[in-house]
Amino acid sequence: MEQTEKSKVYAENGLLEKIKLCLSKKPLPSPTERKKFDHDFAISTSFHGIHNIVQNRSKIRRVLWLVVVLGSVSLVTWQIYIRLLNYFTWPTTTSIEVQYVEKMEFPAVTFCNLNRFQTDAVAKFGVIFFLWHIVSKVLHLQEITANSTGSREATDFAASHQNFSIVEFIRNKGFYLNNSTLLDCEFFGKPCSPKDFAHVFTEYGNCFTFNHGETLQAKRKVSVSGRGLSLLFNVNQEAFTDNPALGFVDAGIIFVIHSPKKVPQFDGLGLLSPVGMHARVTIRQVKTVHQEYPWGECNPNIKLQNFSSYSTSGCLKECKAQHIKKQCGCVPFLLPGYGIECDLQKYFSCVSPVLDHIEFKDLCTVGTHNSSCPVSCEEIEYPATISYSSFPSQKALKYLSKKLNQSRKYIRENLVKIEINYSDLNYKITQQQKAVSVSELLADLGGQLGLFCGASLITIIEIIEYLFTNFYWICIFFLLKISEMTQWTPPPQNHLGNKNRIEEC
């Protein structure tokens, strides 16, 4: 043990000797040399005003210049603090710009019949209304009473018909689009047909999208305002029906206007056109650009697996699909993703409780940067203005009745006319921008330094060099002091003993 302590002492002494030897090669400047170094810095630095403190012979002038320099340093420190404080509040500005163009891309439009099911298919199959109510819960939560008659019937049906595919039923027995339901279609003066529409499932069952991103129509552009898409639908109320008990009491067409790259979102965004009416819709294109965090709330690094472009609605669907797949081992057909399709039994036993859990725990949230689905960094919307007129007129009623070989009452109760066009060939860009960029901040700080102190980046480097040199000399001074103190050795033990004996005498 004693041997170990001795070896440590020898090692420390050896290290100190090495430090002392190294410092002896670079001796500490004398006080005169250090004073000269300080004087040379004061008269040569580009920090204006300091040389006046040193070189002036008058003490009054020296004091005045000292006050001026200290005041300038205080002011520039205050100004820099204010600007840094303002920068780190991440301020933004909003710019609005209107761009006029010769041609504009036409948006996608998704149409659905408010009466979702074929009458003959559901005449003896009334439980399908409640089944679809359960299935479409994945798109937006609905209050479902567990003790209701419809719920019990749906549960019993799901237990006894395990191989039943509600997807195929809706596809085959829901609303369809052909020449009997789409009586007339015209896009920018050219005829179109049901083939130009892409099928899509929504909470309204079978819906059809014109100008879908995967069709050739999506590449067409409108070059004249006031012209666009003109459609004449036959909702055929006798052939299609719905359940008024679930809130479906209207007759007509519901449609939503959206970007061709995005899926339709009806919840709160659908436009209605009732039967016996001509709906004229004028739209504008509005592009909104949001800044990323911390200036804004968007996150440019989020990519969706099943959609080409990011949207909060698409993100919410993927979020729900991931939780359901993890807990239930299947994916609802109304949600994106790959995997086993959830059967009816899974909807009751697993999917519905998981959706309630997602809502209760806020597992899929929208809005801020730290939510599951923050706002889009860039989104395109189509604000619409809609006006109605009675359709058809008395003269047109006679013409259509003869052309379609239908009664006037049938024409009034089943036909819907819809026109969609741009109000102007321009689009508005609303852009959120950084109020202060890094380059602007540096320029502002440099301006403050130059205004109050006549300083620049080179001046700051000079001051840093001066402070570092003095700090280096202070370190050398203390290291030399430490090495001198370690050279002192205590007096031998026998001397202490003799001293004690003398004191005793």
Curated annotation (Swiss-Prot):
The keyword Transport applies. InterPro entries: ENaC. The chain crosses the membrane at residues 62-82, 460-480. Residues 1-61, 481-505 are cytoplasmic. GO terms for cellular component: apical plasma membrane; plasma membrane. Residues 1-30 are annotated as: Binds the plasma membrane and stabilizes the channel in the closed state. A motif (GAS motif) lies at residues 454-456. It holds the Pfam family ASC. The keyword Cell division does not apply. It catalyses: Na(+)(in) = Na(+)(out); Li(+)(in) = Li(+)(out); K(+)(in) = K(+)(out); H(+)(in) = H(+)(out). One of its GO terms (biological process) is sodium ion import across plasma membrane. Detected in small intestine, duodenum and jejunum. Detected at very low levels in testis and rectum. Keywords: Cell membrane, Disulfide bond, Glycoprotein, Ion channel, Ion transport, Membrane, Sodium, Sodium channel, Sodium transport, Transmembrane, Transmembrane helix, Transport. It is found in: Apical cell membrane; Cell membrane. One of its GO terms (molecular function) is proton channel activity. Its main location: membrane. Inhibited by the diuretic drug amiloride. Disulfide bonds join 112-207, 185-192, 298-377, 315-373, 328-350, 330-342. Residues 83-459 are extracellular. Glycans are attached at residues 147, 163, 178-179, 306, 370, 405, 421. Belongs to the amiloride-sensitive sodium channel (TC 1.A.6) family. ASIC5 subfamily. Forms homotrimeric channels. Forms bile acid-gated sodium channels and may play a role in bile acid-dependent absorption and secretion by epithelial cells of the bile ducts. Displays high selectivity for sodium ions but can also permit the permeation of other cations. The gating could be indirect and the consequence of alterations of the membrane environment of the channel by bile acids. As a sodium channel of type II unipolar brush cells of the vestibulocerebellum, controlling the electrical activity of these cells, could play a role in motor coordination and balance. This is Bile acid-sensitive ion channel. It comes from Homo sapiens.
